[in-house]
């Protein structure tokens, strides 16, 4: 709903009619004059039409049944992780602060349990709130993906997306049947895309990050058509120092050969690291 209303306002449409359930989402677009109707009968009557008593009664009955099934408890916002929660880790905290201030990408390498994931999840907490235009764009992307809850209002904080290392290219970049839907790179627009265990991702997924990193846009071609979505994000990679994860750890003996270590990090291509 949100992207459609945004496009209508940009095209100069003066009044936008939506279902009552979609009114909260439609009204998030600045400049939108939204009219909400419970059923099509109200729309007919608004513009001078008349319905027979039987049709009007049937519409009211169907609408009341649908309203009774709708949830009435508003969702609760999840508390966002905060960098202030981190104790110690002064060098890592400073690296995050520099990355946040300059919009730099970041890679963290260390043994398991050293706090890489905890730190990455808290990077959005030190980024500035989204500008109004960016907030509408980010919210629109989540709406197109079908994961936006209008009851929470506009997304005003930089989003964080952290796909699993088994995620497919379609999940990370976007895709699906019919019109392609945005993937994690677009859902992280103006926020953070965090790839934990980065060398474990498939080479195809890692290589497909190069286009959005260079242009801030991702283009998806499917049989159902072509779609371009914004994808300007900060990339944070986390990796173990070797396949077994023990290299560099205190009191731990690495069992990997030098060849295994080279192969492990060779999955992160030079262009991606650049």
Feature locations, PLM:
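Peripheral, non-AAA+ core regions of ATP-driven protein-machinery
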Residues: 1-107, 111-117, 221
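Conserved RecA-like P-loop NTPase ATPase core
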Residues: 8, 39, 96, 117, ...
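Conserved alpha-helical scaffold flanking the Walker A/P-loop in AAA+ ATPase domains
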Residues: 97, 153-159, 170-193, 226
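Walker A/P-loop
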Residues: 107-152, 215
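AAA+/SF3 P-loop NTPase mechanochemical coupling elements
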Residues: 160-161, 180-190, 220-241, 252, ...
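Conserved AAA+/SF3 P-loop NTPase catalytic/coupling segment centered on the Walker-B
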Residues: 164, 180-214, 246-249, 269-273
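Substrate-gripping "pore-loop 1 plus following alpha2 helix"
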Residues: 178-180, 207-229, 248-268
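A short beta-strand-to-loop transition that corresponds to the Sensor-1 phosphate-sensing loop
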Residues: 196-198, 223-224, 237-242, 257-260
């Amino acid at each position: 709903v949100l992207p459609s209303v945004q496009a209508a306002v940009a095209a100069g449409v003066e009044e936008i009619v939506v279902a009552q359930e979609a009114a909260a989402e439609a009204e998030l677009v600045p400049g939108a004059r939204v009219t909400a109707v419970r059923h099509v009968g109200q729309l007919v009557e608004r513009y001078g039409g008349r319905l027979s008593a039987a049709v009007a009664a049937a519409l009211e009955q169907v609408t009341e049944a649908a309203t009774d099934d709708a949830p009435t408890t508003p969702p609760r916002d999840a508390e966002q992780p905060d960098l202030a929660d981190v104790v110690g880790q002064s060098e890592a905290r400073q690296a995050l602060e520099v990355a946040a201030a300059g919009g730099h990408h970041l890679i963290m390498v260390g043994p398991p349990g050293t706090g890489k994931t905890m730190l990455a999840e808290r990077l959005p907490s030190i980024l500035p709130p989204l500008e109004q235009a960016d907030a509408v764009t980010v919210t629109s992307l989540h709406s197109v993906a079908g994961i936006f809850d209008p009851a929470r209002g506009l997304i005003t904080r930089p989003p964080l997306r952290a796909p699993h290392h088994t995620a497919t290219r379609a999940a990370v970049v976007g895709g699906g049947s019919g019109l392609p839907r945005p993937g994690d790179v677009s859902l992280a627009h103006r926020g953070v895309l965090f790839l934990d265990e980065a060398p474990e991702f498939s080479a195809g997924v890692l290589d497909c990050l190069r286009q959005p990193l260079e242009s801030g846009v991702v283009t998806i071609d499917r049989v159902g058509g072509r779609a371009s979505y914004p994808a300007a994000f900060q990339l944070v990679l986390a990796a173990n120092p070797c396949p077994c994860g023990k290299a560099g750890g205190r009191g731990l003996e690495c069992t990997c050969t030098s060849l295994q270590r080279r192969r492990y990090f060779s999955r992160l291509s030079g262009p991606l690291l650049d």
